[in-house]
Amino acid sequence: MKKLLHGALLCLGLLLPLSAAHAASGYTQTRYPIVLVHGLFGFGQLLGVDYFYQVPAALRADGAQVFVAEVSALNSNEARGEQLLQQVQKIIAITGAAKVNLIGHSQGAPTARYVAGVRPDLVASVTSVGGVNKGSAVADIVRGVAPPGSVSEAVASAVAKALTAVMQFFAGTTGQPQYPVGALDSLTTAGASAFSAKFPQGVPTSACGEGDYQVNGIRYYSWTGSATVTNVLDPLSVPMGVLGLAFGSTPTDGLVSACSAHLGQVIRDNYRMNHVNEINQSFGLVSLFEVSPVSLYRQQANRLKNTGL
């Protein structure tokens, strides 16, 4: 009897890890493919480093089908949105899926909203991560010191284009068209307001509330950080802290206020993360006292899965 019991327990011990592994393998397995959309000065990979650092691999490891979009690093929401739409159509053709789940960081959020607005039949959900949905005080300041047609605007545009060209070279991309002025105008409070007038889906009508959770069959979600200097080892923490001064006492991740980042169902708007931490940058050097950014993407994939998306 003891031998039989020992054998049964041994078999159970061997089966439990297999069962747990099988359960974990489907944690992020959404019904529709996930498409990650980068923000301003963004890229797919730069010298082998993901813009969404370690996120695609973490999602794929537990079953998600993940694609990383590559749109203009510097351009208007509409121009980037058209580029994203073309890529979404290709992804649907390749996978045979009926729709995709869009997850956009920073300007990637309004870029995703554009696609959802013009082709709602191709989108299952839009998730905004630190999204510039109501504009940025930083963009407002830049536009103030570089007004339309000014020398300062021309100089800033040339510098931004040169920086983007270098990034594209190291990213090994052929390059999408770059239009810094279009990007800047899209990110100002006025520009974001004009964009939302055309694409209001999921955008809160109050100053800092939630938006509609579902519009035209598309689910809308958002989360963001509200800290600036989060890890002294991260070389981007100090710049985030300096940029955050533009917001005064308003909670911000350094580039976008917490309220501006709201879209649809607000999962949380006060993570101890700055704008780059939200994509697990720089190189995973994030706050030691907050949940891992990668975990948030995994949790969102599981949320989409449980919603049937």
Task: Put a short name on every predicted segment.
Residues 1-61, 309:
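Flexible, membrane-associating and regulatory peripheral segments of lipid-active enzymes
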Residues 26-30, 60-61, 94-95, 103-104, ...:
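Extracellular/periplasmic catalytic domains that process cell-envelope and extracellular macromolecules
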Residues 39-43, 72-76, 105-110, 131-135, ...:
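Solvent-exposed loop/turn segments at secondary-structure junctions
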Residues 205-309:
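C-terminal catalytic-base region of ester-bond hydrolases, centering on the histidine
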Residues 171-231:
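Serine-hydrolase catalytic core
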Residues 55-74:
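Conserved alpha/beta-hydrolase
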Residues 38, 66, 82-193, 253:
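Serine-dependent carboxylesterase/thioesterase catalytic core
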Residues 48, 137-142, 231-236:
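Short aromatic-enriched loop/helix-cap "lid" or pocket-rim segments at secondary-structure transitions
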